[in-house]
Amino acid sequence: MKVAFETLGCRMNQFDTDLLKNKFIQKGYEVVSFEDMADVYVINTCTVTVGGDRSSRQAIYQAKRRNPKAIVVATGCYAQVNPQELAKLKEVDLVVGNTHKSELLKILEEYLERREKKVVVGEIFREKEVRNFDTVLYFEGVRPFLKVQEGCNKFCTFCVIPYARGKVRSVDLEKIVHQVKLLAQKGFKEVVLTGTQLSQYGWDKGYNLYTLLTELIKIEGIELIRLSSMHIKEMDKELLKLIVSEEKIAPHFHLSLQSGSNRILELMDRGYTREEYEEVVNFIVENRPISSIGTDVIVGFPTESEEDFQETYEFLKRIPISYMHIFPYSDRPFTKASKLKPKLPERIKKERVRILKELDQKKRQEFYEKNKGKELRALVIEENRLLTENYIDIKREGYKEVGKLVRVLI
């Protein structure tokens, strides 16, 4: 049988899809492109925004149109959070939540015997571990991504992720160290640590991200350890001092802000003020000037006034960030913010997104100009294409050795 996969949303989903692909291949299935005719289509859904829901449904419709006789399986975060909504779609044959994603192949084979529509979703908050760590390794070319943690213990008022991914579960430190050593032996120079909320790594184990990093930097052969998104209130002084002083830790940090208005930050239950956020950003940039700081911003949060938005704009304009991801607010199931009123009209949200996207382009250009004339470490990710330690993607002739870490003049 032929099986095709479509992955929506974050890298967590990409990890999970790769795990599923391997299981299907081992069972003798032929994995084909989502654009091809297949007997089974697996859509790994996203629900972080209304747009994620919409894109997930569109993928489901596309699959059934491509082959009306195919079995369509909806899994992932949308399936976990709102399974009955997906089950109502005539195009969907199976709904499998994140709790049972690792058993999807077995559930599918049971379906093949009975051909009865089924919803298989468990209680996400009962999940106690990250499953199948040995295969939770995803590659973007020569850059391996390790999922070291899953879930989030912080229930921000706008965010559905804890309901989709559960509470914090961390991979044992020894397993991660072993995996990174294997990657070093294979010649990889950079490794990316990722998770739902990386700064919560180890909370369920009695240790933390600092502990993990102090072990990983000892591994010979790995020259760059890149970190995914972190929350500034989960970064203690030990961790901050380490990331600005240790050369092996890539000077590229994604620190979600969400709003530059203290009133909105409080409504979001983010746990910090813009002044506290600025203090962390300034500490990093002052102590490691080449650092790239990325962030996330939500516009149009319920009750956000023009004054709130202007505070956000002026704050982002002032602080030394290098790029931002901008999202229009959308109500999510189970969240406190979904009950907040008044809601902002779509046209206002779109306009605020547009304004911040213009600022984002200026920030990216400013960061590039700031780095001109500097010699930086960079990984050759494709022939004549490099990614610098501080996340500048550049094209330069004469670099043929893919996977090699070099020094390059910007």
UniProtKB/Swiss-Prot annotation:
It is found in: Cytoplasm. Keywords: 4Fe-4S, Cytoplasm, Iron, Iron-sulfur, Metal-binding, S-adenosyl-L-methionine, Transferase, tRNA processing. [4Fe-4S] cluster 2 binds at C152, C156, C159. GO terms for molecular function: 4 iron, 4 sulfur cluster binding; metal ion binding; N6-threonylcarbomyladenosine methylthiotransferase activity; tRNA (N(6)-L-threonylcarbamoyladenosine(37)-C(2))-methylthiotransferase. Pfam families: Radical_SAM, UPF0004. The keyword Iron-sulfur applies. Its EC number is 2.8.4.5. GO terms for biological process: tRNA methylthiolation. Binds 2 [4Fe-4S] clusters. One cluster is coordinated with 3 cysteines and an exchangeable S-adenosyl-L-methionine. The keyword 4Fe-4S applies. [4Fe-4S] cluster 1 binds at C10, C46, C77. Residues 138-366 form the Radical SAM core domain. Its cofactor is [4Fe-4S] cluster. It catalyses: N(6)-L-threonylcarbamoyladenosine(37) in tRNA + (sulfur carrier)-SH + AH2 + 2 S-adenosyl-L-methionine = 2-methylsulfanyl-N(6)-L-threonylcarbamoyladenosine(37) in tRNA + (sulfur carrier)-H + 5'-deoxyadenosine + L-methionine + A + S-adenosyl-L-homocysteine + 2 H(+). SUPFAM superfamilies: Radical SAM enzymes. One of its GO terms (cellular component) is cytoplasm. Residues 1-113 form the MTTase N-terminal domain. SMART domains: Elp3. Belongs to the methylthiotransferase family. MtaB subfamily. Catalyzes the methylthiolation of N6-threonylcarbamoyladenosine (t(6)A), leading to the formation of 2-methylthio-N6-threonylcarbamoyladenosine (ms(2)t(6)A) at position 37 in tRNAs that read codons beginning with adenine. This is Threonylcarbamoyladenosine tRNA methylthiotransferase MtaB. It comes from Aquifex aeolicus (strain VF5). The gene is mtaB.
